[in-house]
UniProtKB/Swiss-Prot annotation:
Record GO terms (molecular function): transferase activity
GO terms for cellular component: Golgi membrane; vacuolar membrane
Family: Belongs to the GNT1 family.
Lumenal topology ranges: 30-453
Biological source species: Kluyveromyces lactis (strain ATCC 8585 / CBS 2359 / DSM 70799 / NBRC 1267 / NRRL Y-1140 / WM37) (Yeast)
Protein name: Glucose N-acetyltransferase 1-B
Amino acid sequence: MLKRKVRYLLLIVVVFTGIILSVEAIMRFQLNKNVDYYLKFFDKHKDNIENMYDPLNIKQIPYSTIDQLYTKRQSEAEPIDWDKFAYVNYITDFEYLCNTLIQFRKLNDSGSKAKLLALVTDTLVNKSKENKEVEALLNKIKSVSDRVAVTEVGSVIQPNDHTPWSKSLTKLAIFNLTDYERIIYMDNDAIIHDKMDELFFLPSYVKFAAPISYWFVTADDLRTVSTDTKKLFKTNKLDPIEKKLASRVKNSLEIYNHLPNLPQHFYSKSMNFIIDIDGFQKSDNKVNFATHLMVIKPDVTMANDIRDNILPRYLKAKEEYDTDLINEELYNFKELIYYQFKIFRKIQYLFKPSVLILPYTKYGLLTKSIDDKRQKDLLKNAILGYERKEKDDLIQDAKFIHFSDYPLSKPWFYSNADDIQCSKKYSISDENCQLWKSLYKEYLESRAICQVN
């Protein structure tokens, strides 16, 4: 009798398990069909779709489109309230005060009308009361323009961390700057060649935009995504896409669905993560968002979540910094697409995308790329998977160039550009070498404004 009951219970368990697995299989099949349908739908019907956005891709926006959106906004009758927009630096150490002064002076001289906000840690502010040099540099920053504001913030320091990035989580204070409609955050170990006011006028639904970490892309990756793009869309030419986007901007039509996709190759081999996001690692993307320049719509809810939930976890973690937090917790490509599609399936016409990828040659160029033959092809175009007839002119076209030449030190540790030598192993040419060195020379010459008596 007992054996019969056991067999009966086992049979029930087997049948129940079979039903669950069958239901899951049907749901997976149906979800895969939905994914395939909408991938084709948005590609085929994008010219006729209004107020519905592709949830299955992360979009790249060309510089020409960014500039046209800004020109369009300037032509409108309603005046721009520049008090709602700010360029932002954060400063944790004395060595970085001069960099902020240089950047703010350049933005002011190039005609930017936005606010210039320096977030200075409380420890550095307190030091200014004793150190006349710190006080003098803070005063110089304030004197750049009446649009400059210096705000004190609390230091966020990784315990038992002695790396140069131990204070990098202080950067997360930028997400709480809710007095502003949109901010452009900039690491200040970078050189600015022109104002970037156009970035304030990305589509209103975009909460976060940044270049990507293009330096992880290999020559093989470039060939693969170029081929994949041709297969999917019959062409990988960017020029007709830019022309189409220009027409839509001019006619006040939605542009999102016409923007180039970030090739799927960079974040997943398949779209299966849409079915089960927990079964996929967040950190196995080939590229992520770079965080040395970010365009952000500050948000109270996100700021509170960072402060109350995310930051406490990261302060306990070892060697986890601002870039990790932003790409793993806030704007992970797989999770973005997973939740975008989840929302879209429930409320199609209410879904709006929240991120864009900025062209890295314009807003995210690293100095080391300028004279590194391994990255030469990467700098021909800033939209991955696509090609343009006219190539970007490296330094002349770049607005923001980040000093990153490990194992070389940051430029303020040198007194003369002649002390810095190009790589013998990876240098592209003498011309590129001189271009690269010219940035160090430009920076070192600009430090003259930081001298205090």
